[in-house]
Amino acid sequence: MDLHGCAKNQVDAELIIGIMENLSWKNTSDPDEADLIIVNSCGFINSAKEESINAVLQAKAAHPKAKVLLAGCLAERYADILKNDLPEADGIFGNGNLSLLPQLIDSMFPKKTSDEKFIEKTLVPPQIGICGGERPKILNFPRSTYIKITEGCDNFCSFCAIPIIRGRLRSRPIKDICDEIKTFLKKSFYEFNLIGQDLAAYQTGKDDLSEDELHRENCSGLALLLKSISKIKGNFKIRLLYIHPDHFPLDILPIMTADKRFLPYFDIPFQSGAQKIIRAMNRNGAAEVYLDIIKNIREAFEKTNSPYGEPQIRTTFLVGFPGETDEDFNETIKFLKELRPLWSGGFTYSREEDTPSYSFKGKVPKKTAEARLAEIQNAQTSITEKKLDSFIGKEIEVLVEELIQAEDKTFLALGRAWFQAPEVDGAVVLNFNLNKKDIDGNPIAPGSIVKARIAARNGFDLEAVAV
């Protein structure tokens, strides 16, 4: 499995591994021994497309005896083109209904030589899947996993191809999600990161719960899900990743503040602080409205004396959008400084065919967009460093991901604190002696939860000592 793209794609890769194992295939990390190499691709922006295509070319060149299957978003979006223009791919499989993968595998690996002429290279089912299934192999570090709660998106931001690739919004049933969490808890998992194209839209798709059902519960679909999760017994943490700001459900805040297993970490992709650009992106919000959301979040946790202290925000900014002027960009910088997120990701605009913004006028020169990206990243760096410095001297819990042996009898571990999401944020470098134990009294190892005191900051990472 050669994985590309986002956390949603990672869950798909894990589901595919489960399907393949049910077909009696064995997963291997060594491509030299593979009969089949699956490139689970990303098709979101141009750089990701190029990376995925190159992965297919490299896999076929390095392992000519293996068959190469292109799966994922690139396959979903461009199957009709790639089945002719990418002969290195022996098979192409969309992500609309993963349960149909065995059909394509049977075609790629016919039981009789005479069946070769009947091979169907491409299978792109309609977007009807809702991301459930067995995941025997988790591609994260120990005791942490992603839980996908939705597929598709109904927001139709003018720059975004996700609705084209993933289709309209579909929500997993609450029971299905809770049962999956319970299954992982039995396997000693600790951290669950809820993901989807937009968590705020959970249970608002046309085939989801009716408005009458949600009205009867007097809450949003996401709040209803969090209420159900809060009833699950056990020691675990829940992190919410990607909540669209235009319909942020404030009714989740009382649920989260009442249960410390919900981490006060909010991933809200604002994209811009300029009203004109926000509207051009087909979004309904405004900088002052977005800041009010953050104010509500911070006040909710402050009033309840949260053991975590201040909630932390991650966001995303897209610069160089068509028509973005220097004045517009300065409004975004101003918004960022008022927002004060701990983390933010920055990207330059990628012109994607079939999206509304593809035909927008006012193209921003590449050098200008890159200069704006550098400026917003520098502004964020200053904010991040100050916020990380505020943790120095405080005690936190660290989820250990891997061990690194240092000199003498001192050991190092890499891990994450509650305000660090997997892969995208900084890390905690943990110093400890062999006699130190984790919170369960066991030797410190990958997957351990360790109490530690923050001693220093090193760039975007923190240095800590086990206590």
Curated annotation (Swiss-Prot):
Gene3D superfamilies: Methylthiotransferase, N-terminal domain (3.40.50.12160), Nucleic acid-binding proteins (2.40.50.140), tm_1862 like domain (3.80.30.20). The gene is rimO. Residues 139-386 form the Radical SAM core domain. This is Ribosomal protein uS12 methylthiotransferase RimO. One of its GO terms (molecular function) is metal ion binding. Keywords: 4Fe-4S, Cytoplasm, Iron, Iron-sulfur, Metal-binding, S-adenosyl-L-methionine, Transferase. Binds 2 [4Fe-4S] clusters. One cluster is coordinated with 3 cysteines and an exchangeable S-adenosyl-L-methionine. PANTHER family: RIBOSOMAL PROTEIN S12 METHYLTHIOTRANSFERASE RIMO, RIBOSOMAL PROTEIN US12 METHYLTHIOTRANSFERASE RIMO. Belongs to the methylthiotransferase family. RimO subfamily. GO terms for biological process: tRNA modification. It is found in: Cytoplasm. NCBIfam families: 30S ribosomal protein S12 methylthiotransferase RimO, MiaB/RimO family radical SAM methylthiotransferase. GO terms for cellular component: cytosol. Its EC number is 2.8.4.4. The lineage of its organism: Bacteria, Pseudomonadati, Spirochaetota, Spirochaetia, Spirochaetales. Residues 389-467 form the TRAM domain. It catalyses: L-aspartate(89)-[ribosomal protein uS12]-hydrogen + (sulfur carrier)-SH + AH2 + 2 S-adenosyl-L-methionine = 3-methylsulfanyl-L-aspartate(89)-[ribosomal protein uS12]-hydrogen + (sulfur carrier)-H + 5'-deoxyadenosine + L-methionine + A + S-adenosyl-L-homocysteine + 2 H(+). Coiled coil: none annotated. Residues 1-110 form the MTTase N-terminal domain. It comes from the Bacteria.
